[in-house]
Swiss-Prot record:
NCBIfam families: rplV_bact (TIGR01044). This protein binds specifically to 23S rRNA. Keywords: Chloroplast, Plastid, Ribonucleoprotein, Ribosomal protein, RNA-binding, rRNA-binding. One of its GO terms (cellular component) is chloroplast. This is Large ribosomal subunit protein uL22c. GO terms for biological process: translation. InterPro entries: Ribosomal_uL22, Ribosomal_uL22_bac/chlpt-type, Ribosomal_uL22_bac/org-type, Ribosomal_uL22_CS, Ribosomal_uL22_sf. The keyword Ribosomal protein applies. It comes from Barbarea verna (Land cress). Part of the 50S ribosomal subunit. One of its GO terms (molecular function) is rRNA binding. It is found in: Plastid, Chloroplast. The lineage of its organism: Eukaryota, Viridiplantae, Streptophyta, Embryophyta, Tracheophyta. Belongs to the universal ribosomal protein uL22 family. The keyword Glycoprotein does not apply.
């Protein structure tokens, strides 16, 4: 079996919340509102939304930002929620006692939530560097364009 190895990302951090006692459908309703937004904007949205699922997601986003600042030294103003996903967890089954010795089953659904934050300051520096290289007066001998030359000349792409 071939395993997909994750590449080590230097610009992203994540926080994972497992077995949160909430329906995955209800958590997705909140997660869809904050996906793709900045860290500060997401916190503001989560504080003002009137759903019960906002508080555990708020804690996860806050934890991911703490991981970013403590482990990798990122600034919180540059963080963006790049990926937020909700997966269904186990269903906890209980029995509720009823009258005359009977019992009714109760199902508590759980979910797993993953929040990934990315630091966009690296991308801005990268774009500034490319803009510098594209200037007409800039001559950089270390620039390697072999992949573009191979693609434009045909090379491997002409053969089938």
């Amino acid at each position: 079996m071939i395993k997909n190895r994750k590449k080590k990302s230097y610009t992203s951090v994540y926080a994972l919340g497992q077995y949160i006692s909430m329906s995955a459908h209800k958590a997705r309703r909140v997660i869809d509102q904050i996906r793709g937004r900045s860290y500060e904007e997401a916190l503001m949205i989560l504080e003002l939304m009137p759903y019960r699922g906002c508080y555990p997601i708020f804690k996860l986003v806050y934890s991911a930002a703490a991981n970013a600042s403590h482990n990798k030294g990122f600034k919180e103003t540059n963080l963006v929620i790049s990926k937020a996903e909700v997966n269904q967890g186990n269903t906890v089954k209980k029995l509720k006692p009823r009258a005359r010795g009977r019992s009714y089953p109760i199902k508590r659904s759980t979910c797993h939530i993953t929040i990934v934050l990315e630091d966009i300051s690296f991308y801005q520096q990268y774009e500034e560097y490319f803009m510098y290289l594209k200037k007409p007066g800039c001559s950089n001998e270390n620039r390697n364009l072999t992949c573009y030359d191979t693609y434009s000349s045909g090379g491997l792409w002409d053969k089938k």
